[in-house]
Amino acid sequence: MSVVGIVAEYNPFHSGHEFLMNQARLIAGDDPIIAVMSGNYVQRGEMAILDKWSRARSAIEAGADLVFELPFSYAVQAADMFATGGVDLLTRLGAKNLVFGVEDANLNFEYFGDRISKIPRQRQEFADYSQTYSTQYNQMVAREIGHEVSEPNAILGLAYAVANANLGSPLKLSPVNRVGAGHDEILQREAVVQSASAIRNLLLNGAERSELEQWLPKGEIAAFDQEKVLPNWELLFPFLKYRLESASIKELQQIYQMSEGLEYKFKAEIHLAENFADFLRRVKSKRYTYSRLRRLSLYTLLNVTEADVLNSYDHVSTMLLAYSKRGRKYLKQQRKDFEIDIVSKVDRKNAQEGTLGLKVRVDRLFEQIVGADQNFGRRPLEVN
């Protein structure tokens, strides 16, 4: 069985994701496509613009057969941990092939991933404070493999390859050339595919839904029509300000990835910042990327500590969000062989455990923002 896996955020699901899904179907044939998707919080350190259930439905309607939630402690992370979580989950769920979009599918990701995975860990520790960790890491990679990888999706593809190599290469890697606008580019109205960032900006700036019809599926547009509020950092900024002003330095030092005196910088600059964008500019330095600072801001807002994240890894589970008829058949046949607990219903007992417990806790804020329960009382969506 040639089960194909995809690691994604679908923030939101758009025509570029649909193209990749179609390419995955060419590989899978009649076998299932499994998507491991970030929940209500995404890698760049933000709330997803649409809840996980709506995004999972769009994925199934576009051709996926099963959508599982990537736990928060992997989803809101730098590329290496994000990729590790996604590849590990897909492997445990029986996937044999990983399909992902990149700027140049001709790169030998399996070879590069194997090379990088063998670099001693001590050579991946950097002390040049004039550059970000990611910049220094990319420079090291270029030296080791003799090829500079700088495009965002290629960097993530390389992270998948390294994670796969570290796990013993259980997945065949199938990179696919991206189409349309690049990552984080401004809106290009003539383009068949827009970047997710451009679409989010359009939505947050009050675009008419009719403007989005060429880039978003009808079901996704209908979901946006039903939303009273679209989560974003400017909406959350007052809560972050309260959190930083009310917490002690000692409390802030317990926050996951709070290091090198950033707790003092955060606490000092929050008083002066007019909004979240201004706050990020004030705390930015050559040492940290904006993505790292957004993630740290999110950990702070949600009071996610180092202990919370480490403890969550003691019991890793995944929540089934949506499935097709083909997906249901695959689950029935293979579930007993999966090397991971699949959660179909959150109850008072399992809501205290591992990655699920952390996810349920952080989702509480998302629920307050959007006004809808995200875990208790929810069951996987069957989409035909």
UniProtKB/Swiss-Prot annotation:
ATP binds at residues 7-20, 101, 153, 178. InterPro entries: Rossmann-like_a/b/a_fold, tRNA(Met)_cyd_acetate_ligase. It is an enzyme of class 6 (ligase). It catalyses: cytidine(34) in elongator tRNA(Met) + acetate + ATP = N(4)-acetylcytidine(34) in elongator tRNA(Met) + AMP + diphosphate. The keyword Cytoplasm applies. Keywords: ATP-binding, Cytoplasm, Ligase, Nucleotide-binding, RNA-binding, tRNA processing, tRNA-binding. Its main location: cytoplasm. Its EC number is 6.3.4.-. One of its GO terms (molecular function) is ligase activity, forming carbon-nitrogen bonds. Transmembrane segments: none annotated. GO terms for biological process: tRNA modification. GO terms for cellular component: cytoplasm. It is found in: Cytoplasm. Belongs to the TmcAL family. Catalyzes the formation of N(4)-acetylcytidine (ac(4)C) at the wobble position of elongator tRNA(Met), using acetate and ATP as substrates. First activates an acetate ion to form acetyladenylate (Ac-AMP) and then transfers the acetyl group to tRNA to form ac(4)C34. This is tRNA(Met) cytidine acetate ligase. It comes from Lactobacillus delbrueckii subsp. bulgaricus (strain ATCC 11842 / DSM 20081 / BCRC 10696 / JCM 1002 / NBRC 13953 / NCIMB 11778 / NCTC 12712 / WDCM 00102 / Lb 14).
